[in-house]
């Protein structure tokens, strides 16, 4: 279990040594996922014996409280598949009770969306990202290991019906699998308020061969968009890592997440807490800094905030993916991608 000494960090608790400010917390609430995506957990979720349990509702309240006290305004709930937790709605409601948190986003595989999305909205979810890696049901099944394409698409329709104005759809484009779907996705969003986000396949410890076989450069997609008349938009304070493109003839937008791009880390504004209570300064890199011993009481808030602030001073300027170094991350499910 890694801890760090607490040191004085000045008056800006969520500013790192490179003057990047962190307004955005990605909070994983479970490692469990019921899909078996070939780029993430191809063998499905494998529970580990004798490992710590996932954060409790009260621990989640306390960690969000500390981050909010330090300036965080957006929380994204991730997993695994976060909606598999039986207390998912109470978790959302608890986060929503914090007046500093302006946005509560959810990343989901969409498995429960058709049935539950109205309840998610009522509980406080302000925006949804749903993973749809292909618009072809057979390819969707091949990539995810689950024959639920129609259910997910019904869930997407239902999300619009209950009042979400725009949905973000995530797709990991992979050579010789779904890269040919790129143009089909663009046609699909022409008259739909969807931000179609293409995520560049990332190398992890367990997936080196898969990466070498299927990686598609995000820059190739960016060049295609620009040549077709799409224009790059400026980023907002609470936006994620995607480069967003718009076209005058399209209702939808395109987002590109390109971690191998030069200066990808320059605008980083997010920190991660794993489902077992570790602070991760980067998706790729360190093993995490334990917070859980300071998530037992409201009386520990100042200690917790000091630990987070001090840890942030050790955040690196950038990852080393471009050098083939994916850090210690075996897969992306454990800290929510």
Curated annotation (Swiss-Prot):
S-adenosyl-L-methionine binds at residues 39, 80, 131, 202. Pathway: Cofactor biosynthesis; molybdopterin biosynthesis. [4Fe-4S] cluster 2 binds at residues 265, 268, 282. Its EC number is 4.1.99.22. GTP binds at residues 26, 76, 107, 168, 270-272. It catalyses: GTP + AH2 + S-adenosyl-L-methionine = (8S)-3',8-cyclo-7,8-dihydroguanosine 5'-triphosphate + 5'-deoxyadenosine + L-methionine + A + H(+). [4Fe-4S] cluster 1 binds at residues 33, 37, 40. Pfam families: Fer4_12, Mob_synth_C, Radical_SAM. Residues 17-242 form the Radical SAM core domain. One of its GO terms (molecular function) is cyclic pyranopterin monophosphate synthase activity. It is an enzyme of class 4 (lyase). InterPro entries: Aldolase_TIM, Elp3/MiaA/NifB-like_rSAM, MoaA, MoaA_NifB_PqqE_Fe-S-bd_CS, MoaA_twitch, MoCo_biosynth_MoaA/MoaC, rSAM. Its cofactor is [4Fe-4S] cluster. Keywords: 4Fe-4S, GTP-binding, Iron, Iron-sulfur, Lyase, Metal-binding, Molybdenum cofactor biosynthesis, Nucleotide-binding, S-adenosyl-L-methionine. Coiled coil: none annotated. Belongs to the radical SAM superfamily. MoaA family. HAMAP family: MoaA_B. This is GTP 3',8-cyclase. The lineage of its organism: Bacteria, Pseudomonadati, Pseudomonadota, Gammaproteobacteria, Pasteurellales. The gene is moaA.
């Amino acid at each position: 279990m890694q801890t760090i000494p607490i040191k004085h960090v000045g008056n800006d608790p969520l500013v790192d040594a490179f003057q990047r400010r962190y307004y955005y917390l990605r909070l994983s609430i479970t490692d469990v996922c019921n899909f078996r995506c070939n780029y993430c957990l191809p063998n499905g979720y494998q529970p580990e014996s004798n490992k710590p349990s996932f954060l409790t509702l009260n621990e989640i309240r306390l960690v969000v409280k500390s981050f909010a006290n330090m300036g965080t305004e957006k929380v994204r709930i991730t997993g695994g598949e976060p909606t598999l937790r039986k207390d998912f709605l109470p978790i959302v409601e608890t986060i929503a009770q914090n007046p500093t948190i302006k946005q509560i986003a959810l990343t989901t595989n969409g498995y429960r969306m058709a049935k539950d999305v109205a309840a998610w909205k009522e509980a406080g979810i302000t925006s949804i990202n749903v993973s749809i890696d292909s618009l072809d049901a057979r390819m969707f099944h091949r990539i995810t290991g689950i024959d639920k394409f129609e259910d997910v698409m019904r869930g997407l329709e239902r999300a619009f019906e209950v009042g979400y104005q725009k949905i973000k759809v995530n797709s990991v484009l992979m050579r010789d699998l779904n890269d040919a779907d790129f143009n089909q996705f663009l046609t699909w969003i022409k008259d739909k308020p969807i931000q179609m986000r293409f995520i560049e396949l990332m190398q992890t410890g367990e997936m080196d061969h898969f990466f070498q076989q299927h990686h598609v450069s995000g820059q190739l997609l960016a060049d295609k968009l620009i040549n077709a008349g799409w224009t790059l938009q400026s980023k907002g304070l609470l936006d994620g890592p995607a480069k967003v493109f718009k076209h005058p003839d399209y209702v939808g937008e395109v987002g590109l997440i390109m971690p191998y791009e030069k200066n990808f880390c320059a605008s980083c504004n997010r920190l991660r807490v794993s489902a077992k209570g570790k602070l991760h300064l980067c998706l790729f890199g360190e093993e995490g800094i334990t917070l859980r011993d300071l998530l037992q009481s409201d009386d520990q808030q100042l200690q917790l905030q000091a630990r987070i602030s001090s840890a942030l001073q050790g955040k690196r300027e950038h990852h080393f993916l471009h050098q083939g170094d994916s850090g210690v991350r075996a897969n992306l499910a454990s800290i929510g991608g």
